[in-house]
UniProtKB/Swiss-Prot annotation:
Location in or out of the cell: Cytoplasm
GO cellular component, one term: cytoplasm
Protein name: Elongation factor P
Gene Ontology MF terms: translation elongation factor activity
Pfam families per UniProt: EFP, EFP_N, Elong-fact-P_C
Family to which this protein belongs: Belongs to the elongation factor P family.
Domain of life, source organism: Bacteria
InterPro entries assigned to the protein according to its UniProt record, in alphabetical order: Elong-fact-P_C, NA-bd_OB-fold, Rib_uL2_dom2, Transl_elong_fac_P/YeiP, Transl_elong_KOW-like, Transl_elong_P/YeiP_cen, Transl_elong_P/YeiP_CS, Transl_elongation_fac_P
Cytoplasm in keyword set: yes
SMART domains: EFP, Elong-fact-P_C
Protein's organism: Deinococcus geothermalis (strain DSM 11300 / CIP 105573 / AG-3a)
Length: 185
């Protein structure tokens, strides 16, 4: 158990029958009466966000979330299949859990899966991945008045803005947090 005054960004707790991650917190001192802690929590299973206010003496049940290294193998129907890098067990995860990370995952990509017991909560990609451009228009010489970018479709289906000199078939580095082109690989 932890006191609500010990909450920090990223603290994971169990409350109201669900698993929650603290996104924001602030400690308010009142003129009369006790202090209050105003928080914003994200449900780790559904993704919903809730604002909660606690009295300073309240306690919450903290949880331990383990990060497991896994490798993305393939898609099986709607599910994504990952392999645990330690035990080599295969785990099927639904598209709702994988979410937008699928845009930058190709086969054999290593990811970190946040696990609580046997339940997968979220997937974290490496900060940068190298992907091949499968479709982009050729850059036109002299068309660089505004800095010059064009859309390019990656091998995973994601579309990123790349400089005009980048051609189809080129391997590029992409930041998975922002979805932006970084450099040629």
């Amino acid at each position: 158990m932890i006191s609500v005054t010990e909450l920090r960004n990223g603290t994971k707790v169990e409350m109201d029958g669900g698993l929650w991650e603290c996104l924001e917190y602030s400690h308010l001192k009142m003129g009369r009466g006790g202090a209050k802690v105003v928080t914003k929590f994200r449900n780790m299973e559904t993704g919903s966000i809730v604002d909660r206010t606690f009295n300073s003496g309240e306690k919450l049940q903290d949880i331990y979330v383990e990060g497991k290294k896994m490798q993305y193998l393939y898609r099986d129907g709607d599910d994504y299949v990952f392999m645990d890098m330690e035990t080599f067990d295969q785990v099927h995860l639904p598209p709702a859990l994988v979410g937008d990370t699928a845009k930058f995952m190709k086969e054999n990509t290593e990811v970190e899966v946040a696990m609580y017991g046997d339940k997968a909560l979220s997937i974290t990609l490496p900060n940068q991945v190298i992907l091949k451009i499968v479709q982009t228009d050729p850059g036109v010489r002299g068309d660089t008045v505004s800095g010059g970018t064009k859309p390019a479709t990656l091998e995973t289906g994601a579309v990123v803005q790349v400089p005009l000199f980048v051609e189809q078939g080129t391997d590029v580095k992409v930041d998975t947090r922002t979805g932006q082109y970084l450099s040629r690989a």
